[in-house]
Amino acid sequence: MFLLVCSGDVYSQHKTLRTINLVGYVVDSFLDVGITNAKVTLMAQDSTVVDSVNVRKRSPNGMVTYTEYSFNVPAQKSTYIIKAEAPNYKTGYLAYSIKHVGRNVRIEMPTLKLKKSRRYGLDEENVLDEVVVKATKIKMYYRGDTLVYNADAFSLPDGSMLDGLIKQMPGATLNENGEIHINGRKIDYLSLNGKKMFDGNNQLVISNLPYYTVKNLKVFEKNKDEDEALGKESRVKDYVMDVSLKKEYSKNNFMNAKAGIGTKDRMLARAFDSFFSDTWGGIAYVNVNNLNQTRLPGWDGSFSEAASPKSNVENKQFGLSGQYERNQGNVKEEFSLSGDIKDTETEKKQLQELFMPDGNVFKNTDERQDTRISKFKFSNDLQIKKPYLLKSRTQIEYQDGKDNSTSSNETLKEILANHTRKAERRKDRDLSLSQEIVWSALTPWGDRYGFQAKANYECGRVRSGEHQNIAYPRADADSIYEFVANENVKRRAYDYSLYGLYQYELLGGKRILVGYQYEQADEKRDRARLRNNLDDNSFHANTFGRFHMPSIGFDWQKGKWYAFAQLLINLQTDEMKYCKNSLDTLFSRSYTDLRPSLLVFRKSNDSYLELKSNYGSVTKPRVTDIVDARDDSDPLLITLGNTGLKKSSAWHTDVKYSYHNRSNRFSLDVTSNVNLHFNNIVHSYMYNEMDGSYTIRPENVNGYWAAALWLKTENIIGKARRWSFRNDVNYDYSHKIGISGTSSTAMSRNVINSHIVADKAKLSFQYKRMYIAALGGIKYQGSRCDSNVNMNYNAYDIHYGINMNCRLPLDIQIACDMTMYQRKGYDFESINDDNLIGNVSLSRSFIKGRLLVSLTTYDIFHQLSSIERTISDQSNTETTYNSIPRYGMISLTYKFGKH
């Protein structure tokens, strides 16, 4: 079949005259930027003129960085002379010979660098061709295939950060993890003035960059680094958002500092600094606060109960990131250093209902926990490209944690089974190191080949101690069991992988990709649990694995359509050793996984359709899961192994469709997915009715599946485009399987069917600097059990309210939001109530806009609460957390640098 395909392409080659696209660039030899008014002439070896063109601007990172020309010439060996000329520059020449034709369809030539004529000075205006555009109130428009959001057209409260702007942009969604979706598609990474900062961590950039510095945000598709380096056009491109700063901040150092003090011991101190030039840029920030959040009133009214700040959190954050590039971006280095120290005080009440065949078991818990987690991360990326690609990535991560907690809980079915009081302390440290090297190049005949080497090392240690008191109620007298235990767990692991790829270019837009990867991993775990001496729950475990992963893929592109199919075979062998007390066992397991995947999409100017489907292994059992051993270190939670446990696998399918009218009047986004799980690993629960303890054991079950559908519409209303209406509807369904039983009944399967239906709507109006929005939504959660377990839940969450910001007399800005939250159908009666959440902020600027004074009040009615509800295959859990207290704060913000 392979020979047949190749021969068919050869025949096609002779049947029609082939051409090759010659691509080159013209830049200023000193500034290394594009010359926008250059003219390029293609001549034969005897200086006969073949063709001539004017250069066009290329914006691979959303900014004008260089200018490009291209010619289509016959696909044959020949020599050409390229002449480039521009006003105020010396004419430049380049001789280029096509030595290898093969299956090449595009050849990138050396860059032509023109020198200034001596009679002229450096006229930066001719080089940069900067265009000054007067401010417009149009929020968004298309420039070719690039979607541009005009930041000045939006109305935000003073002191807002970039994330506030993104939440107001039409077609944009921003979740709590910092993931950005534009018109239904996820942004792969965010750049700042064309430079990627903080290793692509969107959250760090958007929550620290002041909104007032932003000129516009550009959303576009960009060639991947590998393809750009080799002069290829990517078939699956990165979806990028580039934040363009205003002129006064783009080539200058600027700094923003904010400090605030409030009631209830609230405080805030924050500083942001940045510098950008044509070749390098950097940003730095410091943020210290005990506010749990960065949100300002009047943003978008998304201060929902599920996302409300739970616990009391004090954050200390810092970061430094920079990028340097030269030679038209062919040499680029990026680095980032960040730190995050978080102190959390948590108080929670939890009601858990475990599903049992002869009556459910209830567990009530009260817990107080003080936690400190410190995270530090450093990364460095070096990239060299043209005529090949070489990438090196180094990353170091360190985490240190401390935890002190006290809790009390009681377990009961029809009568109280036990009452427990527990005090626990814990310290942990983790260090991870990783190094990756990627090299890719083209053969003279147009095929691509590449290699990748990657190595990781991790080590960690957990030390903990606990004091537990368990009371078992009896008719005559309570039985008290009390113990003190200390535990020390060490973990060391490494892995490395070697990967090779060859991409065979066929004619007609087809390619064959063949790859092979070898990986080796080793993990050691030592657990020493001490009461008075080393007890039976101490162990040593070691897992050594080898992976061989050959793969073959085929992709095809024609017009607006693209398809890619791949089959990867994972041949894995694990050698496991487990030592515990008198048990010393050594065994091995082998797995063969077939992992097919399919990607199909169609793109046009106003729509995008995508189908993605893949099958593969999800979870492989750990050595502690498959060894025949018992762990009763917690007398109320006993763990058993299962020697017959198998790996689990799943089939995932996603379908996306987006339609967006280029007039920006209407947009539609539809997303659906289906997940089918096979041999899903769950933990069976056996409840001991005598003492209230549980014995859990990993098991394989079939029948678990889930599906979801999400529909979003957005419409801009009126000729003046002042009104907009957005509606989001989503439906989630899950069919979960669990196993449970008691000491007096046999183990049985529980089939849990859960439905979540939600609808959120927002109507907004903006006129000049006044913005007002009305919003509302309802969410239904329903769960039922098809077996003999008693379970039938129906809960509702309803919210509605308004938010606004506008200018008052004396140049005072007010921003506020008011939202009513209602909950119905929860098991905790105290949860079923109404909460009115209100926030107000007043601000005014002084010293020509350099100084901003703000007065802010949060939760003015003191009704904020934090609730979570989860339903698994074994239980229904409702948890209430302490929330940050209501407070008022006065803050000062000062802008340094040119303004």
Region locations from a protein language model:
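Short Pro-Gly-centered beta-turn/loop motif in secreted/extracellular proteins
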Residues: M63-T79
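Outer membrane beta-barrel strand-and-loop segments of large Gram-negative receptors
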Residues: N364, N537-F539, L640-N642, K646, ...
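Signature of Gram-negative outer-membrane beta-barrel scaffolds
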Residues: A485, D495-S497, G509-N605, L609-K612
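C-terminal beta-barrel architecture of Gram-negative outer-membrane proteins
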Residues: V729, I772-S845
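Outer-membrane beta-barrel translocator domains and adjoining extracellular loop/strand segments
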Residues: L230-G231, V286, R295-G301, E345-V361, ...
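Membrane-proximal, glycine/serine-rich, low-complexity loop/turn segments characteristic
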Residues: S12-T19, D32, T41-M43, S47, ...
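A short, amphipathic beta-strand motif
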Residues: I20-S29
